[in-house]
Amino acid sequence: KIYAALEDSKVWNYVTICVFNPETFKAEKYATMSLEHQVKGAPWLCVDAENGYIYSTQRDNAPCLVAYDLETLEFVKTISISQPVHKIQGGEMYGSDLFVATNNDTQAVYRIDVLTGEAEKCFDRNLATGSEGEGLTALETADGAVLHVLDMGPLFVNANFRHYSYEVEA
């Protein structure tokens, strides 16, 4: 299944989770997200199959993760984050933690414990002026990289897919 956040750009009246069939790309199910918690849309979402949730946040200075039921897509709860995380662009579960990429001043990557909400900055990317930090995926590769993060260049005519090693404490 493919899970996606859909927005009515710059209006945010119909912020939606949609589930697509990966073979046909047809929408199979959708639900409106919590407008109370998805202030200025839903710039990203992440599936946590182990705990049965889909996570998202508001765009600016997110005070909490917003958890939706993986099967029904209904709002379940919020999880307070220990420090606001600004402009999250994408995230993925790796082990029991959520890693998120931002488009904040340093395009930082953060680790968030989804059970406690404890957030810590892993590293800054410090991209060229005008670049935009985008999404991230987690996948162990033979060269030791774990986090793979996308960024767009200042003129949006080039994209970089950067690979980072990161040791997760047990």
Describe each region flagged by the PLM.
Residues 36-48, 84-93, 129-140:
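Repeated scaffold domains used in trafficking and secretory/extracellular systems
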Residues 7-9, 57-61, 103-105, 141, ...:
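Short loop/turn segments immediately following the C-termini of beta-strands
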Residues 21-25, 69-73, 113-117:
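Short loop/turn segments that connect beta-strands within beta-propeller blades
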Residues 1, 50-52, 95-97, 143-145:
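Short coil/turn segments that connect the beta-strands within blades of beta-propeller domains
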Residues 26-36, 74-81, 118-126:
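A short beta-strand motif characteristic of beta-propeller blades
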Residues 83-114:
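Loop/turn-rich, solvent-exposed surfaces of beta-rich toroidal or solenoidal domains
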Residues 1-41:
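Hydrophobic alpha-helical segments and helix pairs
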Residues 10-19, 62-67, 106-112, 155-170:
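Structural motif
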